[in-house]
């Protein structure tokens, strides 16, 4: 049995660049192609290692900046042979270009009632398809801010997968599943409705605290160990998170060498482990055993200490403005 690897990249306009009053071309550049390590670079690395990745694209900025930037994202991804699925940050619903971010809708999808969430998902789906994407079958809420109303709406709309549950950010991820749930599952309320939850993979950081399997959150060694653990323990799937802008500093004008090295190491590791840990698109609909009791990688103080030292360098040196 193999372990399915979902390498997911949330692809969006960074709100901070909109709030800074930048024009749409500069927002695109700093969010999608920052410092030469954005979409183009990431797609090239994926191709070099013959890996599959899912790009969760948020089309909602089209409400104020038009559909062309979203079409550009979608075509770049699809032309590279990768997959586009739906991401949604509802703050863009009441945003105004050039107002410094003062106007905005609610930032968390889960702050809306079920009917409003459904309407937002329908609206976002229509925008994504208008931008040239196939009709999405997988979804991730912005900031993982989904709840059971989100799952109800997705099931009703015919989605096959949600990947919003993240036990490491339980303050915003409100799906009623255990924090340590990392195996694919159909929540009881969704039995027979066709929607499978694919949780984001987490590892144990300290007693009672979890950390996301994400480029900016774990060192290369920790990520590799988490993948090895998943294979050795016979996990059904691992779900890795990154962002289109994550390999650059927050200003989007300088590459973060720590994060770039982590991405390159992750791609090399997934390439080397492809027989046991094949990367998948959600559109592949890989067979997934449901309800398995997969456990996060246990904490390791040495790995944690090494990562904290690396993080300190990343935050103090690599995050400097270019």
Predicted regions and their residues:
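Histidine/acidic-residue-rich catalytic or RNA/ligand-binding cores of hydrolases
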Residues: 95-98, 174-177, 248-257
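Hydrophobic faces of well-ordered beta-strands that scaffold small-molecule active sites
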Residues: 5-9, 53-55, 84-88, 137-139, ...
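The substrate-binding groove and active-site-proximal loops of carbohydrate-active enzymes
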Residues: 25-33, 56-64, 106-115, 137, ...
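Metal-dependent polysaccharide deacetylase catalytic core of the NodB/CE4 family, i.e.
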Residues: 56-145, 242, 250
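Active-site-adjacent pocket scaffolds in enzyme catalytic domains
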Residues: 140-235
């Amino acid at each position: 049995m193999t372990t399915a690897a979902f390498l997911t990249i949330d692809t969006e306009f960074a709100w901070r660049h909109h709030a800074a009053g930048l024009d749409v071309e500069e927002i695109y550049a700093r969010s999608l192609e920052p410092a030469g390590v954005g979409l183009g670079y990431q797609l090239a690395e994926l191709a070099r290692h013959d890996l599959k990745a899912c790009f969760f694209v948020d089309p909602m900025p089209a409400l104020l900046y038009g559909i062309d930037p979203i079409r550009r994202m979608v075509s770049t991804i699809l032309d590279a042979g990768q997959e586009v699925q739906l991401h949604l940050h509802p703050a863009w619903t009441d945003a105004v270009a050039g107002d410094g971010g003062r106007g905005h809708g609610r930032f968390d999808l889960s702050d809306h009632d079920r009917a409003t969430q459904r309407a937002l998902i329908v609206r976002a789906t229509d925008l994504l398809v208008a931008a040239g994407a196939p009709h999405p079958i997988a979804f991730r809420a912005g900031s993982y801010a989904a709840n059971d109303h989100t799952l109800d709406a997705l099931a009703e709309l015919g989605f096959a997968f949600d990947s919003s549950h993240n036990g490491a950010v339980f303050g915003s991820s409100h799906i009623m599943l255990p924090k340590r749930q990392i195996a694919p599952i159909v929540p009881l309320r969704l039995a027979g409705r066709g929607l499978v939850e694919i949780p984001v993979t987490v590892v144990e950081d300290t007693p009672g605290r979890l950390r996301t399997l994400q480029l900016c959150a774990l060192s290369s060694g920790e990520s590799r160990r988490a993948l090895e653990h998943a294979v050795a323990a016979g996990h059904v799937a691992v779900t890795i998170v990154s962002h289109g802008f994550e390999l650059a500093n927050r200003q989007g004008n300088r590459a973060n060498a720590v994060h770039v090295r982590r991405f390159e190491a992750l791609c090399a590791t997934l390439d080397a482990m492809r027989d046991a840990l094949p990367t998948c698109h959600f559109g592949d609909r890989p067979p997934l055993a449901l309800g398995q009791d997969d456990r996060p990688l246990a904490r390791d103080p040495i790995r944690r200490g090494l990562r904290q030292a690396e993080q300190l360098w990343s935050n103090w040196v690599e995050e400097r403005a270019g």
